[in-house]
Amino acid sequence: MAEKRNIFLVGPMGAGKSTIGRHLAQMLHLEFHDSDQEIEQRTGADIAWVFDVEGEEGFRRREAQVIADLSEKQGIVLATGGGSVQSKDIRNHLSARGIVVYLETTIDKQVARTQRDKRRPLLQVDDPREVLENLAEIRNPLYEEIADVIVKTDDQSAKIVANQIIEQLGF
């Protein structure tokens, strides 16, 4: 890989963006960033707190700034938040500044992977499956719109998925 290209991971919560991203960055000797972790570092608070205090709109503003800043770097793997693609500006940033990989997963897998995770504010409801289905209806077409590569993450280890991404990208 002569030039340092950015790889941006998009997909729903529970698709494995952070875990796969760490493996991918390590395998390609790139820097790894997670937009949610970056927001937590910058605010000194967890995502749930940001949602509680600033609402989803405040969180999305912070997320847009973090992604704009990080996507300026060269040679990174960035795991984005599941809802980040709802912003046209973010979609444009990602498409223009790197390779976008959509990590696709089923609602069943999302439910299984997120059911005990209290750090996901949008899922702290009586019926998280319904929330995930509604989000998928809105977001999946946006993931597909900007994806250079689509990789299914169901029933595969993060390492195998990272290898599939490398293979598909020809690195």
Curated annotation (Swiss-Prot):
Domain of life: Bacteria
Catalytic reactions of this protein: shikimate + ATP = 3-phosphoshikimate + ADP + H(+)
PROSITE patterns on file: SHIKIMATE_KINASE
Key word Transferase present: yes
Keywords of this entry: Amino-acid biosynthesis, Aromatic amino acid biosynthesis, ATP-binding, Cytoplasm, Kinase, Magnesium, Metal-binding, Nucleotide-binding, Transferase
Pathway note: Metabolic intermediate biosynthesis; chorismate biosynthesis; chorismate from D-erythrose 4-phosphate and phosphoenolpyruvate: step 5/7
Leading EC class: transferase
Coiled-coil ranges from the UniProt annotation: none
Cofactor(s) listed in the protein's UniProt record: Mg(2+)
Residue numbers binding substrate: 36, 60, 82, 139
Annotated compartments: Cytoplasm
Predominant localisation class: cytoplasm
Binding, Mg(2+): 18
GO biological process entries: amino acid biosynthetic process; aromatic amino acid family biosynthetic process; chorismate biosynthetic process
EC number in record: 2.7.1.71
GO cellular component: cytosol
Binding site for ATP: 14-19, 120, 156
Pfam families documented for this protein: SKI
A molecular function (GO) term: magnesium ion binding
Quaternary structure (record): Monomer.
Family, similarity comment: Belongs to the shikimate kinase family.
HAMAP family in UniProt: Shikimate_kinase
Function: Catalyzes the specific phosphorylation of the 3-hydroxyl group of shikimic acid using ATP as a cosubstrate.
Protein known as: Shikimate kinase
